[in-house]
Amino acid sequence: MAITYLKKSPKTSSTDDTKTTGIVQDLLKNIETTKEQGCIDLTKKFDKYDGEIIVSKERIEEIKKTLDQKTKDDVQFSYERVRKFAEAQLKNYGQDFEVELSDGLFAGQKLIPVNTAGCYVPGGRYAHIASAVMSVTTAKVAGVKNVIACSPPKEGVGAHPTIIYTADLCGADVILNLGGVPAIAAMTNGLFNNPPADIIVGPGNQFVAEAKRILFGKVGIDLFAGPTEIGIIADAKADPEIVAVDLVGQAEHGYNSPCWLYTTSKELAEKVMKRVPELIAELPEVPRTNADAAWRDYGEVILCDTDEEMATISDEYAPEHLEVQTENLEWFHKRLTNYGSLFIGEETTVAYGDKCSGTNHILPTKGAGRYTGGLFVGKFVKTLSFQRMTKESTELVGAAAARISRYEGMEAHARTGDVRLKKYGYSS
C-alpha cells in the first residue's frame, strides 16, 4: 500500500538549528567568563526580572499560604501518580510492567531494542579487537536486529583481519572498511545500502568523538568519549611495582591519556614516580612515545591524609577506569560513587576489563562518570511508557488535566480533557 501525505510540513524541527547553535554558543561563552553576574544580566535582558535568583524558604512558605487550595489539590493529584509510576519503574527496572495508578488508570513500560546499531571499532594506532567484542556482542544480546561494524582499513588490506573475524563472530550483520569521520557519517546516513543507524557506539580518536558529538540528535550515541583515563587509589599496603605498571599500561594508549595516582603514602608515591619512567623506557617505540608524553603532560600523583580524602578527590575526577589497591577494599567499594569501571584489589587490572574479563570497556571519560555509566545492553534498548484508562477514570484525570493546563495557559490542552468529559457525561 502506497503512503500518501494529505498534508506535509514545509519545515522540520531542525530548520532553525544553525541559527540557534550560534546564539547558544555565544551565550555559553559569555556565562563561562562572567559567571553568576552573566546569568543575572541575561535574565534581566531576556526575562525582564531583576529579583533574587535563589528562591528563599520564606518565598516558598508565602506561596504555600496564598495559593488556592484547588490548585494545590490538582498538583498533589499529579504528583501522587507520577511518583507512583516512578516507584514502579524503579522496582521493575529493566523489565516490562503495567501498574494501576488509580481506579481505571493503568500505566506501564515496554523495553524495545533499537532496530539498527552502528559499532565503531578503532584500528589506527592499535588493532582494537576487544572493541568489536564489547560493542557488537552487547548490541546483539540487547536484541538489535541489524548491527553494522566499521573499522579503519589499511592500504591494500582493508580492516584488520582479526577485527573482521571478531565482528563476524560476535554477530555483526554488515562490516565496512571505513574509519574516522566517513565511518560515522556512513552509519548515520544509511550509506552503502544500509539503514541509518539509530545509535552509534564505540571508542575512537578525537575526530571520531567530534563527529559523534556533532551528529548527536540525528543519531543516538553511547557517550561523549575523550582520551582514556586511569585513576589508582593506593595506600602503604599497595605494591609500587604493580601500581607503576598499571599506570603505564593505560598511558600507552595515547599522548593525551591522563594517569592519576591518589595515595596516603609518600613513600609509595616516590617509588612509583621513580619507576614509571623506567618502565616507559623499556617499551617498544610507539607505546613508549605515547606513554612518555601522557605521563609527562597528563600524569598526576596526589598525596592525601586519609582514605576519605582519596575517595573524595577520586570522585571529583570520576576516572574512566579506577583501581583500588588498599587495605580496606570493601570500604572503598561502598564509598566511591563516580567512575566508569571499578577494579577492586591488585589481583585485577584495567587490561583485564579492556580485553576479556567480561565488563565493558566503552566507558565515560572527562568526568562523565558523575552522571553516566559505560556501554551496557540498556544503551541499545528504549524504555517506552504507555497508558490506558477507562471512561470512568476520566472524571478525575480529565478534570485535573484540564485545570492544570489552564493554570499553565495552555487552553488547547485543556480542551482535550473537556471534550472527553463532555462525551462521557462528566462536568469539567
UniProtKB/Swiss-Prot annotation:
Which residues of this protein are catalytic? E320 (proton acceptor), H321 (proton acceptor)
Protein residues bound to Zn(2+): Q250, H253, D354, H413
Q: Which domain of life is it from?
A: Bacteria
Q: How is the cofactor bound?
A: Binds 1 zinc ion per subunit.
**Could you tell me one molecular function GO term of this UniProt entry?**
histidinol dehydrogenase activity
What are its cofactors? Zn(2+)
Q: Which UniProt keywords apply?
A: Metal-binding, Oxidoreductase, Zinc
- Family recorded in the similarity comment: Belongs to the histidinol dehydrogenase family.
Q: What is this protein called?
A: Histidinol dehydrogenase homolog
